Amino acid sequence: MTIRNQRFSLLKQPIYSTLNQHLIDYPTPSNLSYWWGFGCLAGICLVIQIVTGVFLAMHYTPHVDLAFNSVEHIMRDVEGGWLLRYMHANGASMFLIVVHLHIFRGLYHASYSSPREFVWCLGVVIFLLMIVTAFIGYVPPWGQMSFWGATVITSLASAIPVVGDTIVTWLWGGFSVDNATLNRFFSLHHLLPLILAGASLLHLAALHQYGSNNPLGVHSEMDKIASYPYFYVKDLVGRVASAIFFSIWIFFAPNVLGHPDNYIPANPMPTPPHIVPEWYFLPIHAILRSIPDKAGGVAAIAPVFISLLALPFFKEMYVRSSSFRPIHQGIFWLLLADCLLLGWIGCQPVEAPFVTIGQISSFFFFLFFAITPIPGRVGRGIPKYYTE
């Protein structure tokens, strides 16, 4: 190729050369397993959420008198509207399932350790943004569970000393959840996915600064191959399997994670007998309820994310992967079981023995992060990880 042809080649232009560098020729450890495909899958889920959300917004009316009917209009009158709604509603759960798997893979292989501290912290911020976005997106259908879920969750801010009630009034736009609340939540639900997309690009850029971790936790600049075509083809297996799972979900069981009360228009007079949050809030909900005091329960939510953010700043471990750390591996599986137990407790009534089980499970959840540095110092016989 002549110099003139190289100058006008698309791959030589700044934007295309950047894409080529980060998506095609990006050097990747050759021993990555299928667990490393969930990051890309999460990006695909985010794109699906943004695209379906834009089309749904074309037919949705953010007004308390029209919101519920506009959702039914999408389901019944808009061609393909039922598919758009089910893809968007269940796509949020699919997105969070993928991200949870992505996080637990990072915990198992200690992907938060040096030199990828910033990558992990950005990921935790993205996870927090996702939860906020999912909560805000649960309000626009304006069913009974949407209304009362918004009322209960936003009321938690009243536990903040001095300014709590002012914050709640500001969130509501009045003295109760009403039209102003619906409008501002709908507007924020448009904005936050764009912030999520930007944060995801920063997350990707930070990852590519030092390269991906690998199942062995061993740093090497030699044993690497280009992402394309090798890992594109390998990840295709996971993407096809996920697409099949998601298709079965939205075509055969689209309401399996929904709540029947949300098919009743919002009514501030009757309170549902049991207000249950979406499944991705259940572990946090269980931790919140495990402390009898309202202010203490709300205060316990912050340490969940602070604990995740603090992981990279623990003392450096001699070996990274849990495959070589049986003590940490056992603790990890106990944490996974504990999170599943917290999820189950979160949807149970506030009564014995569920409260006691929730308190024990919450204690172990925080204990895991407190003792994480200890097993990391065990195993001096295994060669230390080097970043140079």
UniProtKB/Swiss-Prot annotation:
One of its GO terms (cellular component) is respiratory chain complex III. Heme b b562 binds at residues 88, 189. Its cofactor is heme b. Disulfide bonds: none annotated. A ubiquinone binds at residue 208. The main subunits of complex b-c1 are: cytochrome b, cytochrome c1 and the Rieske protein. PANTHER family: CYTOCHROME B (PTHR19271:SF16). This is Cytochrome b.
